[in-house]
Design a protein with these regions (language model features):
Chain A
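C-terminal coupling/interaction segments
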Residues: 263-304
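Structural motif
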Residues: 149, 245-248, 278-279
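ABC transporter nucleotide-binding domains
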Residues: 2-7, 12-204, 208-210
Length: 304, 272
């Protein structure tokens, strides 16, 4: 097995502040690897290290078999990068800007830019500074994908994109994978990348908390449930639910509508079966924001 | 070799120029306006009845020498005092300050340098090409200056040797390049536009002040030796021709400063 990205104890400190703390990651060639974590977890720092925009304090990284520092410009021609905060300015059209980036990246096949722009619904004749955030993001995606690089490094690629374009983006990722390209992407929301990524690493405070496939991560994710009942006794419901080991933080608010809230770790099967005898008016299962589910993951890891 | 075929010549310099041509147009108009305003006025001052010398004589002691107005009666002295040594110098300093601080530090502060760096270009290439873009724009303003002064040479009566006009404009160009090299290097080292601007404007101002102080008396004449402004203009290039040795020193220092800036830039983290 070859690795498109391999890091060993990769560490980046800014003064006393540790942005990335001894991260070991391997991304298999041809895979789609997601990195999730709250803002400030170190996702962007890790990506900048891979592109030699910043240098590690200690540890090392290998990208496409080379160190980003010694690989230099030639290595970066084989990478397509989308920065997390894409700032595009200037009185130039999208087409002219992309032409410039094509000149300083790997060779771009004729017609490729137009094909990508059309897929994403991006107007290349407009001046860059007049573009909305979503359209700038599309421009950023085009410049990352256009030279069909061996490795795509995409920081929060779906941010600002509407759901239809997100779908198109996911199909571009799948095509890239089909072509043998490797995709390394980040998000602060698991749901945005769960359909794309084979493997996911959860980052928190600069360390990798967990690595696994999406299914196993989802199974261990903590979700918040809200259930409304009518025509039932609050005490009966409480008794039935207290018996469930997966359910925590239970509250039962009595009234005409009895509202039950709680958090569920893992599958919700047992919960659904436990409430089946009662009259359920509404059932909402919400994925917690990643901040809290990562905290749960983190504390679970610490307790084991 | 297919990769080298798609590589084009100086992509970053061309982008730099393409992004800035509107601004350059404005600077060209400013430089042209200053020359077209000041140089033709010489004929109205230079006549026997103009009393120009009397006006200078009436200025407080030291002010005339501070402003470099000792020799306003000759065409060379007049163009030196009004354009090359004053308005032109100020315009070149401001242009060099703005352009050099924007080239690396401004781009870094705005966040767009990150994306350029992520492509197939080295830091050294970015430093070299963007510096070249700034130098080219300053060269353009120098060429415009020389051509306009030469165009007005007869009609205004300044009566300068064409080679000396070119020498004087090369000296002005040199001071612009020196200021720009400090702005580019400090911008590349610190990534801060304010530091870059301070360095570029500061080196010009320092040279001007040292020269003015050196003009005051023979006791402090040695201050001239420290002033790039004096290196460029001290020998009165419009009447005597350029002092190529001193200009070589100015361009040499600029090159060293740029190399130092590129050296540090190549080794530091780029922030966003």
């Amino acid at each position: 097995m070859t690795y498109a990205i391999e890091t060993q104890a990769l560490t980046k400190r800014y003064g006393k502040n540790t942005a990335l703390d001894g991260v070991d990651l391997v991304v298999e060639t041809g895979s789609v690897f997601g990195m999730i974590g709250p803002n400030g977890a170190g996702k962007t720092t890790a990506m900048r290290l891979l592109l030699d925009i910043i240098r590690p304090t200690s540890g090392s990284a290998t990208v496409l078999g080379q160190s980003p520092i010694t690989g230099g410009a030639a290595l970066r021609r084989d990478i397509g990068f989308l920065p997390g905060e894409l700032l595009l300015e200037g009185r130039v059209t999208g087409r002219s800007l992309l032409k410039h980036y094509a000149e300083i990246s790997g060779p771009v096949a004729p017609g490729r830019i137009d094909a990508l722009a059309e897929r994403l619904g991006l107007d290349l004749t407009r001046h860059v500074r007049t573009l909305s955030k979503g359209n700038k993001q599309k421009l950023g995606l085009v410049q990352a994908f256009m030279h069909e690089p061996k490795l795509l490094v995409l920081d929060e690629p779906t941010s600002g994109l509407d759901p239809l374009v997100q779908q198109e983006f996911l199909s571009m990722v799948r095509e890239a994978q089909h072509n043998g390209q490797t995709v390394f992407l980040s998000s602060h929301v698991l749901s945005e990348i769960q359909n794309a990524a084979d493997q996911v690493a959860v980052l928190r405070n600069g360390t990798v908390v967990k690595v696994g496939d999406v299914a196993s991560l989802r199974a261990s994710a903590v979700r918040r449930v809200v259930i409304d009942f009518t025509d039932a006794a609050a005490d009966d419901i409480r008794t039935a639910l207290l018996a469930l080991p997966q359910l925590d933080n239970l509250t039962v608010a009595d009234g005409e509508v009895i509202q039950v809230t709680g958090t569920v770790e893992g599958h919700i099967d047992a919960l659904v079966k436990a409430i089946a005898p009662f009259h359920v008016v509404d059932l909402r299962v919400e994925e917690q924001d990643l901040e809290s589910s990562v905290i749960d993951l983190y504390s679970n890891e610490a307790n084991k | 070799m297919s990769q080298t075929m798609t590589r084009s010549i100086l992509p970053l310099t061309r982008r730099n120029l393409a992004d800035s041509w509107r601004g350059l147009l404005g600077w060209t108009a400013g430089v042209a306006g200053a020359i077209l305003l000041y140089v033709p006025l010489y004929s109205s001052f230079s006549g026997d009845n103009a009393g120009f010398e009397d006006i200078i004589g009436s200025l407080p002691d030291g002010l005339a020498s501070t402003l470099g107005f000792q020799d306003l009666a000759s065409g060379a002295g007049y163009v030196q005092a009004t354009y090359l040594g004053l308005i032109g110098f100020v315009l070149f300093t401001i242009a060099a300050t703005l352009w050099s601080s924007a080239a690396i530090a401004g781009d870094e502060e705005s966040g767009s340098l990150e994306l350029t760096l992520a492509h197939g270009v080295s830091r050294v290439q970015i430093m070299a090409e963007r510096s070249f873009g700034v130098v080219l724009r300053l060269l353009w303003l120098s060429v415009v200056s020389a051509l306009l002064i030469l165009a007005l040479n007869d009609s205004s009566g300044i009566d300068l040797e064409p080679a000396h006009v070119i020498g004087g404009c090369v000296a002005l160009f040199g001071l612009g390049v020196l200021a720009a090299s400090f702005g580019l290097a400090i911008g590349a080292i610190t990534g801060r536009r304010s530091f870059a601007s301070a360095a570029a404007a500061g080196i010009s101002l320092l040279g001007y002040i040292l020269n003015s102080l050196g003009n005051q008396s023979a006791d402090v004449d040695w201050l001239h030796n420290l002033s790039p402004y004096y290196w460029a203009f001290g020998n009165s290039p419009l009447s005597e021709g350029a002092d190529w040795g001193s200009l070589g020193l100015i361009f040499g220092i600029s090159a060293v400063v740029l190399v130092l800036g590129g050296f540090v830039f190549n080794r530091r983290d780029v922030s966003a």
